[in-house]
Amino acid sequence: MTDTTLDDVFKEALDRYQAGEPAEDLIPVFKDICDRARKSSPAWTCLAWLYLLADKYNSALKAAQKAVKLNPQDPQARVNLAVAMLETGQKGVRKHVEIAQQIAMAIPELRDELQESFDDGLKRKPNWASLERVQAWVFDG
């Protein structure tokens, strides 16, 4: 019997997402990962994204806040937080968008990853106004 590490579980869950599995099905998996790895910013970032896709905006806000607290330099965590804030009517979105924009401009690989994430979100959830707004702010200023 093999020993499955939390990293393996995380990678498998990401693979399932990338294969098109619905966000609602993956939320419990990522919630469990976050419960077991409380300081894993990537896990919290993924959970926030899944909550956003599932229209669970208050839960997304909490998960995104945790991800940003754990890694303030993660532009995806900042984007998730900005979208969750827009969806829940919070103030202070600009600060998170500006930080994501600065990081994306400084590091081309992260810019490309962000663009892929925006594309994925709009493919899974067409006409997602908040995501479209944040995308325009990050890339067009």
Describe the function of each predicted region.
Residues 83-86, 117:
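Conserved short hydrophobic patches within well-ordered secondary structure
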Residues 91-93:
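Short, charge-rich, low-complexity interaction segments located
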Residues 42-46, 76-80, 95, 111-116:
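Alpha-solenoid helical repeat scaffolds
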Residues 50, 84, 121-125:
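TPR/TPR-like alpha-solenoid repeats
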Residues 10-71, 76, 87-89, 100-102:
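Alpha-helical adaptor scaffolds
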Residues 103-141:
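Terminal, low-structured helical/coil segments at or just beyond the last alpha-helical repeat
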Residues 4, 39, 73, 109-113:
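Structural signature of alpha-solenoid helical repeat junctions
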Residues 1-6, 139-141:
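Long, contiguous interaction/recruitment modules in multidomain scaffold/adaptor proteins
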